Design a protein with these regions (language model features):
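Solvent-exposed loop and edge beta-strand segments that line ligand/cofactor-binding
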Residues: 1-6, 77-78
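A general structural signal marking secondary-structure boundaries and capping sites
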Residues: 22-23, 43, 124, 128
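Active-site-proximal alpha-helical segments within enzyme catalytic domains
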Residues: 4-24, 83-99
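Active-site Gly/Thr loop motif
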Residues: 37-94
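Structured C-terminal helix/loop/strand segments within mature extracytoplasmic catalytic/sensor domains
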Residues: 74-134
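Non-transmembrane alpha-helical segments in soluble domains
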Residues: 13-20, 36-40, 64-66, 121
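Stable alpha-helical elements in mature extracytoplasmic
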Residues: 8-12, 31-35, 113-116
């Protein structure tokens, strides 16, 4: 919904959690699981690459969602000026970013963002450190 949706970080996180749960939220099926499955299946990778987007190898785009099959596997909804909703299904993780980039398209920020998310996921997989203090 380019320039047509206004949501708080919490609301976007709820949408992400619903997508993570294959369309379920608040104890009920909100959208059919088959619709979510279709969204996250992604589009034609070769057509995506032929479109000239070179910084997202292996990704695809379908039905307003960007799909990354590379580790850590994710799908994302990206809005103008840096608004982002990332879902990492293998890690049960939803990340919301509300940005204020000076340009409406901030695609090159996806590279450092995805690296940061990969580092976050690696850290979350490690056991918690204890300091010995109560």
């Amino acid at each position: 919904a380019f320039a047509g949706m206004s949501a708080s970080a919490r609301d976007l996180a709820r949408i992400g959690q619903m997508l993570l749960q294959r369309g379920r939220g608040a104890g009920r099926q909100i959208i059919p699981a088959s619709v979510v499955d279709d969204l996250i299946r992604g589009g034609d990778v070769r057509a995506f690459e032929a479109g000239g987007i070179t910084h997202q190898k292996g990704w695809s785009y379908r039905s307003q969602f960007w799909v990354n099959p590379n580790a850590p596997r994710s799908f994302a909804a990206k809005g103008a000026y840096g608004q982002r909703l990332y879902v990492f299904p293998d890690h049960d993780l939803v990340v919301v970013m509300l940005g204020s980039h000076p340009q409406p398209v901030a695609a090159l920020m996806d590279i450092p963002h995805h690296r940061a998310f990969a580092a976050l996921i690696e850290r979350l997989k490690q056991p918690a450190r204890t300091t010995g203090k109560p």
